[in-house]
């Protein structure tokens, strides 16, 4: 039997650290097969193919970010009911979230597949990479149900305090993805489409195995027929939280789309540099994202248990870990950015290497801003204030749009490099007072309940 874990008692730092580690390893593995995708495509198919895969990165983030946000949102009521030990309602939430996932993922897959070509044209994708970008993006969209369930099941399991089980299945998915990448690209010669097929298929296999394992091993999830029925009241709660979290990712991605569209207009070398730099950056951001995800579960459970003071302890502990990590990462990327870029492109591609290095040097200088963003945003989401988290995404969107419209045409690629850091700062300026407001309100709620 798999075990769940309560985070409502004990020192915050070791609890969060130990919960973060499996999430971190999982996110690193996820980024590893993203790196492998790009490395195999770049090394064996050339920089045009690498640019094809990267030309739609922000669009993929827009669509899949919405799906992943919904999945994370669906896990919040589960974590809250688990923290409150209301296991019957918790099981009902799990059942309804799975039912909603079926409908939502199929509808999104159909809609995005139909408009795939139009999306790439809107992105000003260069003609010489359009065909490869279309093949890659279409397969990714068709595979959205696999991605949706892949993330939803992880969110549910994490809500129960178990961050290890999703990691084990992610190991399987990563190994399978790498093998299929090599087979589809080198043996079958399917090019960019083969890279997408490998990713979607490996996620589908992992999602299926997670589902089987979850219901066989977690006794706490085995519900009665009544608990497994669709309940509109619970569905409204899930959609209210999930859609708002999904929109937060999508709103953020709109700014990213504008930024990438502006970058696409700068030519293939800039697209290839942006692609390789983003893959490297996302790899090094995994600990910050994992720390934020841990805080969502930590804050959700302690909110459900009526212990807001532990949420503040969690903020302090996670911020300390974030500062240490970002300092180390700054040294690594300032010294080794070009070496990491060589994973994707040949040494002869001097322009691409230099632009990749420039992007990484600027980004890593602002990692503490992103670290604070992750901690505060996920904490606010964990206690159910998803509207505020969504508004922070609006701040990011506005910053990226302003950079795209005014700075990139005037200053070129270096302005693209500053797009994300400006967005992180804008979000922090909103999130810091937002968290103070939420925390004070939670404390008042506890005091009111105690008096009553």
Please describe what each predicted stretch is.
Residues 1-20, 78-143, 187-242, 299-366, ...:
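Short alpha-helical transmembrane segments in multi-pass integral membrane proteins
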Residues 14-75, 79, 243-263:
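Signature of the first transmembrane helix
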Residues 18-34, 139, 150, 173, ...:
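Transmembrane helical elements of multi-pass membrane transporters/channels
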Residues 32-51, 120-127, 183-190, 250-279, ...:
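Helix-terminus/linker motif at the lipid-water interface of multi-pass membrane proteins
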Residues 41-61, 127-132, 192-195, 234-241, ...:
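Interfacial/gating helices of multi-pass transporter permease domains
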Residues 50-110, 147-166, 273-337, 370-392:
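Small-residue-rich hydrophobic transmembrane alpha-helices
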Residues 62-65, 109, 177-182, 207-211, ...:
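Hydrophobic transmembrane alpha-helices of multi-pass small-molecule transporters
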Residues 71, 139-158, 166-174, 195-208, ...:
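Short runs within selected transmembrane alpha-helices of multi-pass transporters and secretion channels
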């Amino acid at each position: 039997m798999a075990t769940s874990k309560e985070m409502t008692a004990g020192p915050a730092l070791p609890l969060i650290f130990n919960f973060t580690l499996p999430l971190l390893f999982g996110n690193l593995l996820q980024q590893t097969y993203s790196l492998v995708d790009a490395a195999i495509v770049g090394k064996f198919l050339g920089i045009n193919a690498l640019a094809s895969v990267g030309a739609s990165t922000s669009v993929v983030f827009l669509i899949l970010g919405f799906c992943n946000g919904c999945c994370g949102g669906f896990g919040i009521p589960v974590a809250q009911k688990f923290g409150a030990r209301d296991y019957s309602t918790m099981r009902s939430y799990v059942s309804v979230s799975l039912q909603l996932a079926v409908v939502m993922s199929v509808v999104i897959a159909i809609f995005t597949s139909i408009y795939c070509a139009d999306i790439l044209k809107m992105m000003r994708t260069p003609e010489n990479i359009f065909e490869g970008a279309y093949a890659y993006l279409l397969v990714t969209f068709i595979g959205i149900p696999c991605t949706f369930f892949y993330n939803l099941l992880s969110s549910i399991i994490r809500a129960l305090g178990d961050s290890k089980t999703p990691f084990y299945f992610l190991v399987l998915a990563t190994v399978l993805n790498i093998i299929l990448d090599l087979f589809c690209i080198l043996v079958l010669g399917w090019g960019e489409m083969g890279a997408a097929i490998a990713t979607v298929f490996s996620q589908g296999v992992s999602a299926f195995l997670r589902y089987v394992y979850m219901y066989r091993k977690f006794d706490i999830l085995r519900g009665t027929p009544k608990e497994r029925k669709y309940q509109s009241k619970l569905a409204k709660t899930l959609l209210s939280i999930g859609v708002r979290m999904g929109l937060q990712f999508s709103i953020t991605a709109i700014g990213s789309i504008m930024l990438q569209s502006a970058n696409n207009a700068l030519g293939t070398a800039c697209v290839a540099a942006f692609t390789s730099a983003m893959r490297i950056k996302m790899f090094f951001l995994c600990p910050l994202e994992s720390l934020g995800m841990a805080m969502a579960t930590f804050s959700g459970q302690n909110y459900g248990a009526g212990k807001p003071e532990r949420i503040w302890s969690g903020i302090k502990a996670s911020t300390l870990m974030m500062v240490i990590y970002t300092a180390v990462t700054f040294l690594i990327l300032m010294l080794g950015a070009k070496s990491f870029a060589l994973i994707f492109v040949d040494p002869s591609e001097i322009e691409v290497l230099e632009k990749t290095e420039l992007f990484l040097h600027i980004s890593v200088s602002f990692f503490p801003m992103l670290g604070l963003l992750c901690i505060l945003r996920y904490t606010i989401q964990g206690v159910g204030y998803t509207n505020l988290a969504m508004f922070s995404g609006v701040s990011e969107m506005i910053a990226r749009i302003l950079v795209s419209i005014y700075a990139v045409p005037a200053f070129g690629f270096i302005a693209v490099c500053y797009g994300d850091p400006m967005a992180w700062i804008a979000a922090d300026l909103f999130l810091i007072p937002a968290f103070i407001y939420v925390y004070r309100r939670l404390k008042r709620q506890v005091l009111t309940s105690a008096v009553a």
